[in-house]
Amino acid sequence: MIVNRADPEQLDGIEEAVAALRPQKTTPVWAIPEDRTLVAPSIDGILAAVDGRLIKGDPDRLGREALTIVVAGMSMVNVLPRLTEESVVVIPADRTEVLLATLLADASGTFPRVAGIILNGPFPLPEPIVQLPDGFTS
């Protein structure tokens, strides 16, 4: 018997509990720990789900997994501490200061690396904002 998505800190206890309930005591029991990356959607999958398109960035990064989602409908001062490793950050398209702060945080090396950014809303990005990240590396 195999128990999947098990709490990594409780593997032995889970195996023992399941072993006690098995009908045939000779059947081995294993527990496989939860792995967030196995259930995380890819950036490409999220892009398809929201009918989005790549505006900037390396298309090779679209295969990365999004481990969490940060909804950034707040000022950059409040968004930055909420960034987590490999998160997708959803930013209102008219909050360009939050977009720029997120891009800078991602490039800085002092904040968690984000997996992607989704801009939400009908507002086009101003051309200077589109040009600014051209000097950043992916």
Where are the language model's segments positioned?
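Conserved GTPase G-domain signal focused on the G5
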Residues: 10, 39-42
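Beta-strand-loop-alpha "switch" segments that mediate conformational coupling across diverse proteins
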Residues: 26-36
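A short acidic, often aromatic-flanked loop/helix-cap motif at beta-alpha or helix-coil junctions
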Residues: 35-40, 62
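Gly/Thr-rich phosphate-binding loop signature of adenosyl cofactor/nucleotide-binding cores
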Residues: 49, 53-106
